[in-house]
UniProtKB/Swiss-Prot annotation:
Expressed in tissues rich in motile cilia. Belongs to the CATIP family. Its main location: nucleus. This is Ciliogenesis-associated TTC17-interacting protein. It comes from Danio rerio (Zebrafish). Keywords: Cell membrane, Cilium biogenesis/degradation, Cytoplasm, Cytoskeleton, Membrane, Nucleus. The gene is catip. PANTHER family: CILIOGENESIS-ASSOCIATED TTC17-INTERACTING PROTEIN (PTHR15505:SF3), RIIA DOMAIN-CONTAINING PROTEIN 1 (PTHR15505). One of its GO terms (biological process) is cilium organization. The keyword Heme does not apply.
Length: 356
């Protein structure tokens, strides 16, 4: 394993702007308004559907600290190449990354490139573990960044929350330069700029959308730029990386239900969970035994529901695993599952809620 540690001297020339550091100290009420799900479709220049994209933010807890759980997911086939990205992260109320898992894959004709990145705060450092699997073998690397040099740091996960906040405020202040990681996990600058207003067809409706540009300037790689457009309430309407042959678009307007914005989220729908029919047994005719059975059943359901509420990442983890499994359709499911979870099994998490 390759390991490197960046000292303060090595990172001091990379700093977020004062306005960016001030902006990141966001009022709690602004963050609370960004807790919803977006679901978009990935389409080609000709309008052909290539895949799907979703991102959701919910309340959660991490090592007994109230925080937010973000799950972003993108899967599809671009230029006849299956590919996908999944991000699961715990984000503090100060937009600090507590822990983040980032998984990307590209399934080429003769090989599959698989990249997993795990980010976690440990003591006074941000630790980044990289595992890249290719046909030639597995490469691992650990990077450590002192937290004292990361004021104004925004990861891929916290970027989604930051964009929603800017979109709801309908303004991007001048000189919004944050710190971020490039594709090789090198510390880089991430610059946000307003693109102004334009119109977009969503279903049968013509809506006004506000655009934000994000560019990551890397010292060793070419810069990468994304254009994201949002509806006035912060819902994502379109997203594209410049140079990519695909764009993500919102096909249907979110709808209002009981005063809460709801969107269709494609991962797991609780109403579609199969229910096993109960086989009649003789003991059911005994009122006392049947009453005890119902009491125990409700007790277990409450216990399971409590566990799921305490670990919302379980839904995201299982959904990701099933999607990767169905996309690749391996002959040996057990080996595939072992390889999928192996990079995370060797991690040494500092808190209770970070095992994905």
């Amino acid at each position: 394993m390759e390991e490197s540690e960046l000292t303060q001297n090595e990172t001091e020339e990379l700093k977020a702007s004062v306005s960016a550091v001030e902006f990141i100290h966001i009022a709690q009420r602004d963050l609370e308004q960004c807790l919803f799900a977006d679901s978009l479709v990935t389409v080609s220049d000709s309008g052909r559907e290539l895949g799907d994209f979703s991102v959701s933010v919910t309340k959660a807890s991490y090592n007994e600290e109230l925080c937010y759980l973000l799950h972003a997911n993108s899967h599809g086939t671009i230029d006849d190449v299956p590919c996908g990205t999944s991000i699961v992260a715990y984000i503090s109320r100060k937009l600090e990354i507590l822990e983040e898992n980032h998984h990307e894959y590209v399934k080429l004709e003769k090989k599959t490139v698989d990249r997993k990145i795990h980010i976690v705060r440990q003591d006074d450092q941000l630790v980044v573990d990289r595992v890249i699997s290719e046909r030639e073998g597995v490469k691992t690397q650990t990077l450590k960044f002192p937290l004292s040099s990361l004021d104004g740091f925004v990861s891929e996960a916290s970027n989604f929350l930051l964009l929603r906040i800017m979109a709801r405020q309908k303004i991007v202040p001048e000189n919004m330069t944050f710190l971020s990681l490039d594709a090789d996990s090198g510390l880089s600058k991430s610059v946000y700029k307003a693109l102004g207003w334009q119109k977009q067809m969503v279903g049968e409706d013509l809506v006004d959308i506000f655009g934000i540009e994000r560019t990551i300037y890397s010292a060793n790689l070419s810069s990468a730029t994304w254009h994201c457009f949002f509806m006035p309430d912060g819902h994502l309407a379109s997203r594209v990386q410049l140079g990519s042959p695909a764009v993500m678009k919102l096909l249907h307007l979110p709808f209002l239900l009981d005063g809460v914005i709801k969107t269709f989220f494609f991962l797991v729908e609780k109403d579609k969970i199969p229910v096993m029919e109960k086989k009649p047994l003789i003991w059911e005719e005994d009122m006392e035994l049947y009453s005890k059975f119902l009491d125990r059943k409700e007790e277990l359901k409450a216990d399971y529901s409590s566990y799921l509420r305490q670990h919302p990442e379980l839904k995201a983890l299982l959904a990701d695993f099933l999607q990767f499994l169905l996309l690749r359709k391996p002959q040996d499911v057990f080996s595939f599952a072992r390889d999928f979870f192996a990079p995370f099994a060797s991690q040494s998490p500092p808190g209770k809620s970070q095992e994905f």
